[in-house]
Amino acid sequence: MNNIIKMLNEEQMKKDVPEFGAGDTVVVKVRVVEGGKERLQAFEGVVIAKRNRGVHSAFTVRKISNGEGVERAFQTHSPIISDIEVKRRGRVRRAKLYYLRERSGKSARIREKLSTK
């Protein structure tokens, strides 16, 4: 029984999900259906939380739109998500960046992680 569940979960998981974590700036391209048309909508922001649970993995992205903070939670392996692109790697010391909700301006900045080649 356990093996069957594992097989079904692995079948439904996406293979092309990039490696990212809290503090990274990502662009999530979401399929949106308006009327009869389907289009891609980009949501760019900072990952403030990530939950790794296999098929049930999720992450939360926060951005500032017109001076107002907007957060959106995405299921990592959802068919609604067409692409996840990592724009910038952030260097943070926490797994969950909920403290950014109270911050604005310069205090909400995240240091950039320098890549080692």
Swiss-Prot record:
Pfam families: Ribosomal_L19. This is Large ribosomal subunit protein bL19. InterPro entries: Ribosomal_bL19, Ribosomal_bL19_CS, Ribosomal_bL19_sf, Translation_prot_SH3-like_sf. The lineage of its organism: Bacteria, Pseudomonadati, Pseudomonadota, Gammaproteobacteria, Alteromonadales. The keyword Ubl conjugation does not apply. Belongs to the bacterial ribosomal protein bL19 family. GO terms for molecular function: structural constituent of ribosome. One of its GO terms (biological process) is translation. It comes from the Bacteria. Gene3D superfamilies: 2.30.30.790. Signal peptide: none annotated. Keywords: Ribonucleoprotein, Ribosomal protein. This protein is located at the 30S-50S ribosomal subunit interface and may play a role in the structure and function of the aminoacyl-tRNA binding site.
